[in-house]
Amino acid sequence: MPEPTFHELAQLPPPVLRQLIRRGDYAGHTSGLGQRHLQANLVILQKSWADEFLRFCALNPRACPLLDVSEPGSPHFARLGADIDVRSDLPRYRVHRRGQEPVEVNDIGAFWEADFVAFAIGCSFSFEQALLDAGIGLRHLELGRNVAMYRTAIATRPSGRLAGPTVVSMRPLKAAEAIRAIQITSRFPMTHGAPLHLGDPALIGIRDLARPDYGDPVPLAADEIPLFWACGVTPQAVLAEAQPELYISHAPGHMLVSDRLYDEL
């Protein structure tokens, strides 16, 4: 049986897509998948870090809009889907150990610990369908790429051992489209809301749009403005500085696709 095309994958209901991912039959990015459904960034921490991280999310709701938190040791997000298992239902994960480069894997069952607490954080991929419905084209989708993401000079509000830079995702749009995109995305605070910045990237500490820190480069046309949304990769940048002994995250752009619609929250 031939592998499904990306267009075919985009039509799959989230439970079917997750089954495909769980079996190891898809390991690519999730931008453009699960149309109209919430996608979530993932952070998994040992319980000794969980309270600090929960407070960090509360202090930084633009970058870390919290969708759900698991019970200690549980790999399930009951609010997001009855059969979700965070150990296997994302296409790609990063396992981070103190002092080592992160390792990317497609399943984290072998790394799971009894005191792990999982956090689901809203993702801007969720509102992309609303932009498309309004006739606003998205360059990264047209090119079949992941979105471009950058570390910025915008500091997060600290919580205990957790502090560091805000990460943003970038989408280039013409001026009229940019105005409409701001209006549309401001309605969805649980998926990062309106952009944090638009225009000159240097003003927020980004040196070169052609060299994103995460994801893929997305070209900017002469008549376009870059718009920057707060991004759920922010916790990875912050945790990289805090250096827990062990934590697990999604690989940037490889999200959990939930059963909840993006406009339900």
From Swiss-Prot:
Disulfide bonds: none annotated. The keyword Zinc does not apply. Keywords: Lyase. GO terms for molecular function: lyase activity. Pfam families: D-Glu_cyclase (PF07286). Its EC number is 4.2.1.-. Belongs to the D-glutamate cyclase family. HAMAP family: Hydro_lyase. NCBIfam families: PRK05463.1. This is Putative hydro-lyase PA14_37210. It comes from Pseudomonas aeruginosa (strain UCBPP-PA14). The lineage of its organism: Bacteria, Pseudomonadati, Pseudomonadota, Gammaproteobacteria, Pseudomonadales.
